[in-house]
Amino acid sequence: YEFKVSGDDINTTLIDLSSNDYFGLSRDKDVINAAHETTLIEGLGSGSSRFISGSRPIHKSLETNLGKWLNQDSVLLFPSGYQANIAAIQALTDKNSIIIADRLIHNSLLVGSKTSGAKLIRFLHNNLKDLEKKLSKYSIINNSILVVIESIYSMEGSIAPIEKITKLCKKHNCKLLVDEAHALGILGNQGKGLSHPFLDSI
């Protein structure tokens, strides 16, 4: 997004290519006003985790609306994408599982994989041949395999061949986790992310 910079020696408009604020919503007047109005009603924080007493009607409302938008039975909000990734991997694996992950996955996915107790195997970035080689090797000895990828890799912008990866996972009877952090709301039909057309296979 564009933003103005001014000072003693500079007065110009720049384009931000280094942040995750793709649409400049952090400085959008309508968003700021809506946040202000909501703060007057909800306050500045819930006071505790949702597990204790921090679950507010606004959380439930957002989860319900996101679920309808994404055609999902339910959606669960987390304080951050980092925490969501760690929790998702730990929910889908255990010490007897094998995780086969792209070499360029985000650190949160890597931390989740390592703390899950599962065996972690890496495959070459977006390399279907290397992925299938590892799936063929490990699916013979383990029936609890989770493949971990990102739909779009934040560090260098490459897009995963999701359709082909879903077919490989189906062929080898494996689960697939797709991190949509940098695609949801931006890419795909109606901004629903790049994996949305293949949800029945994920």
Regions found by a protein language model. Give the residues of each.
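N-terminal "arm"/small-domain region of PLP-dependent enzymes with the aminotransferase-like
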Residues: 1-44, 174
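Conserved N-terminal alpha-helix of the aminotransferase class I/II PLP-enzyme fold
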Residues: 33, 37-80
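Substrate-binding/gating loop at the entrance of the active-site cleft, primarily
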Residues: 80, 100-117
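Conserved PLP-anchoring active-site segment centered on the Schiff-base-forming lysine
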Residues: 88-107, 128
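Short, structured coil segments at secondary-structure junctions
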Residues: 95, 115-117, 172
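Active-site phosphate-binding strand-loop segment of PLP-dependent enzymes
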Residues: 121, 125-178
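Conserved active-site segment immediately N-terminal to the catalytic lysine
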Residues: 172-173, 192-202
